């Protein structure tokens, strides 16, 4: 039986485009796969929300993991963006439990982060081979033509966004 670990992922959105990354080819987990910035929720992630607007109802540990991962992977300060108004909204978008194909399964909480404009992002070259802004349909087309590798939860999320970019919470996308 696979161990389940909690994770978070950020779907940064500006108008009809979202930010996706390609993971470095030397990484042990999903090398070369298209994904969203994010990672594991750690025990060290605080269980209180910081002082910033628009955080009501969010899970503190997940939110702090999201902040940490965005800072590590993209040099992006989520709290500063909330405080200065460049981030319009942070909301849970979907939950997905990866299929049991490895020793560890990730239960990923995806968060949509609506931005007023594209931020200046600096990808961590140790983790990220490429950063791109595309529509969900463009990203899915890369997968369909064999130009992109994606784990099932990433595809499920993109399919939901392709159907309705302004959707609220897509709910649990895990296979039933």
Regions found by a protein language model. Give the residues of each.
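Cytochrome P450 core scaffold surrounding the K-helix E-X-X-R motif
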Residues: 122-125
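Active-site segment of metal-dependent pyrophosphate-handling enzymes
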Residues: 4-6, 48, 52-120, 145, ...
